[in-house]
Design a protein with these regions (language model features):
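Amphipathic alpha-helical interface elements
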Residues: 1-164
Length: 164
C-alpha cells in the first residue's frame, strides 16, 4: 500500500463520510414526511384530527397519548408552551404506521406502491435512531447506511411532487 493511510483508517473515513452524508437527507426527509402526514390527517379527519382520529381508528388511541406525553415532557423540560405539533414527537416508524393505517388516502402520494414504501421505511428506521443519537459510525453497517440513503432518495421522489 503506497498510501500513508492504513486500510483500517480509510475504511473508518469511508464509514464516517457515509454516516454524515446520510444524516442531513434523513433529517430533511423526516420533516417533509411529517408535513405530508399532518396534511393527510387534517384532510381525512379535519382540523381537530388529534381528537377526532382516535374516535375512528383504535391505532390512534394508543399512539397519540404516547406522543402527547413526549410533548408534555419537552414543554416542561424546556419551559416552552404554545402550539406544538404532536407529530414533531413521532419517529419514522410511527409515521410509517400512520401512512399504512391510512393507506387508502396516502396510496395516491406513493403511487400505490405499498411494498416499496414499507421496505424503504424499514431501511430508514434501521439507521434512524443510531444516527439521531450520534452512535459511533462503525457500529452502523455501511450497507444499512447506503440502503437508507437510497430509500430516502426513492421516497423523496414522491414527496417532492405536487399532490392533487
Amino acid at each position: 500500500n503506497s498510501s500513508c493511510l492504513s486500510d483500517v483508517f480509510c475504511s473508518y473515513l469511508q464509514k464516517k463520510h457515509c454516516y454524515l452524508s446520510t444524516w442531513e437527507p434523513l433529517s430533511n426527509f423526516e420533516q417533509a414526511l411529517r408535513l405530508v402526514v399532518k396534511s393527510g390527517l387534517e384532510e381525512i379527519y379535519g382540523p381537530q384530527w388529534v381528537t377526532d382520529a382516535p374516535k375512528r381508528k383504535p391505532y390512534y388511541e394508543k399512539i397519540f397519548p404516547q406522543l402527547n406525553a413526549l410533548l408534555v415532557k419537552e414543554q416542561a423540560t424546556f419551559k416552552r408552551g404554545g402550539d406544538v405539533d404532536l407529530l414533531e414527537f413521532s419517529y419514522p416508524g410511527t409515521l410509517k404506521d400512520i401512512i399504512i393505517t391510512e393507506w387508502d388516502f396516502f396510496c395516491d402520494i406513493f403511487k400505490g406502491n405499498k411494498t416499496l414504501f414499507k421496505q424503504s421505511m424499514d431501511a430508514i428506521c434501521l439507521v434512524r435512531n443510531p444516527l439521531a443519537h450520534a452512535r459511533r459510525a462503525e457500529l452502523i453497517p455501511a450497507s444499512n447506511l447506503w440502503a437508507a440513503k437510497k430509500a430516502i432518495d426513492d421516497l423523496n421522489v414522491f414527496l417532492d411532487k405536487p399532490h392533487d
